[in-house]
């Protein structure tokens, strides 16, 4: 959504136009004081509506900015979380293989000189170093 998009509508009279409007007196016309009092009430309402519209436009702009900010944060967070498991999985596999290799050396270390173990283990641990 575009935060700069505003609904345009035609306003015929502003509060100042209503205040400054002078009516002609006719013989059988309305009481000018009553008309003025009524129009003063309309002016107050009109100004209140105008202030509320301005406040809502400002709030709308702030909310669109906040949505944009949160969308960017979410995008960054998704990118980081998508990369993190791959990195952690590779590191975890490497750590497991390293610990397994150390455990094998500890358990079978004294037997590595035996010929029976040498027949099954060629001493090549290059697959451990690959990870």
UniProtKB/Swiss-Prot annotation:
InterPro entries: Cell_cycle_GpsB, DivIVA_domain, DivIVA_fam
Keywords for this protein: Cell cycle, Cell division, Cell shape, Coiled coil, Cytoplasm
Source organism, top-level taxon: Bacteria
Name of the molecule in the record: Cell cycle protein GpsB
GO cellular component annotations of the record: cytoplasm
Record field: compositional bias (Basic and acidic residues): 117-131
Renumbered residue ranges of the record's region Disordered: 111-131
Function description: Divisome component that associates with the complex late in its assembly, after the Z-ring is formed, and is dependent on DivIC and PBP2B for its recruitment to the divisome. Together with EzrA, is a key component of the system that regulates PBP1 localization during cell cycle progression. Its main role could be the removal of PBP1 from the cell pole after pole maturation is completed. Also contributes to the recruitment of PBP1 to the division complex. Not essential for septum formation.
Coiled-coil region(s): 39-76
HAMAP family per record: GpsB
Biological process annotations from GO: cell division; regulation of cell shape
Subunit structure, interactors included: Forms polymers through the coiled coil domains. Interacts with PBP1, MreC and EzrA.
Subcellular location: Cytoplasm
Organism whose genome encodes this protein: Lacticaseibacillus paracasei (strain ATCC 334 / BCRC 17002 / CCUG 31169 / CIP 107868 / KCTC 3260 / NRRL B-441)
Record family assignment: Belongs to the GpsB family.
């Amino acid at each position: 959504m575009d935060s700069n998009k505003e609904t345009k509508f035609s306003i015929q009279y502003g509060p100042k136009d209503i205040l400054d409007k002078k009516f002609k007196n006719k013989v059988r016309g309305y009481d000018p004081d009553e008309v003025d009092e009524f129009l003063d009430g309309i002016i107050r309402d009109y100004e209140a509506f105008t202030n509320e519209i301005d406040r809502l436009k400002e709030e709308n702009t702030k909310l669109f900015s906040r949505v944009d900010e949160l969308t960017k944060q979410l995008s960054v967070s998704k990118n980081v979380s998508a990369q993190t498991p791959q990195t952690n999985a590779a590191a975890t596999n490497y750590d497991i293989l390293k610990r397994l290799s150390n455990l094998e050396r500890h358990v079978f270390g004294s037997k590595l000189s035996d010929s029976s173990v040498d027949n099954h283990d060629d001493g090549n641990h290059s697959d451990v170093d690959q990870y």
